[in-house]
């Protein structure tokens, strides 16, 4: 995303979202009672007739609800119009702003938290785009690694004849590998991918990598997995070589933190905290080093819980903790939600209070 204008004394940022990940970031930043200004259109009736036409206009709404479906290119923000053209009489009425990549908006807040500004800062730097492909002799899957998690682009079967017919088997295999390479090339161009990670049992992945490199110079990492398809994608994400290559991606960082959390939970439980009460206590004593919070917890309807979570994040940020918001639809997000929506790795052992 790009920051087009910024005046924190007046409480606003004008932002240009550039892709789906930016919309997801805005979904986690904009809160009820914030105000959002954007160009939109609205049905306006003419006189006493029942006919109406859609009129373009710029409106400011006080936010009530937000809706964002992962891997879509639209963020819907619903609220009450507080500023708009007087001649259309829209003030006080509900309206929904549809925010898309390439469409600027202004966000107004009573006060921007340091954590919210950190999220903005992180998403204004260029994000690494990583394509993942896993396959075996039976099936293949291609996915895009994003800040929202794993976006499955395509899954297909090989249709290779059995090995009892060696000639047909080899022809079928070559056709299958070429097809995988062509699909990967198409997605490289479509998403302007920086890194491609290809994995399979044996060394089939190297053959696909050679086909791709003959047609396009691109950074390719090859590795092995025991199976293709979506299961292979999940296995691939746990490989150290892949984690090292894409370590700046938040979902990979989050998985690494969660793995360390589980390890400490069983062996050294005083080095972790989970659930609002325990994490709040750990933040109070400056013990939190890394923190994962589910996006669902940020948007919980209980206003008191939402206030506590916001306070935890702001205090943790001030005390230089690393904070990552994890998407609900990801494996990491579901695990974190099962642990109370928030987990932390600690800087030093901390005994929990008895009444906690």
From Swiss-Prot:
It is found in: Cytoplasm. It comes from the Archaea. It holds the Pfam family eRF1_1. The keyword Nucleus does not apply. It is an enzyme of class 3 (hydrolase). Keywords: Cytoplasm, Endonuclease, Hydrolase, Metal-binding, Nuclease. GO terms for cellular component: cytoplasm. Its EC number is 3.1.-.-. Its cofactor is a divalent metal cation. InterPro entries: eFR1_2_sf, eRF1_1_Pelota, eRF1_2, eRF1_3, Pelota/DOM34_N, Pelota_arc, Ribosomal_eL30-like_sf, Transl-rel_pelota. GO terms for biological process: nonfunctional rRNA decay; nuclear-transcribed mRNA catabolic process, no-go decay; nuclear-transcribed mRNA catabolic process, non-stop decay; ribosome disassembly; RNA surveillance. One of its GO terms (molecular function) is metal ion binding. Belongs to the eukaryotic release factor 1 family. Pelota subfamily. May function in recognizing stalled ribosomes, interact with stem-loop structures in stalled mRNA molecules, and effect endonucleolytic cleavage of the mRNA. May play a role in the release non-functional ribosomes and degradation of damaged mRNAs. Has endoribonuclease activity. NCBIfam families: pelota. The N-terminal domain has the RNA-binding Sm fold. It harbors the endoribonuclease activity. Monomer. This is Protein pelota homolog. It comes from Staphylothermus marinus (strain ATCC 43588 / DSM 3639 / JCM 9404 / F1).
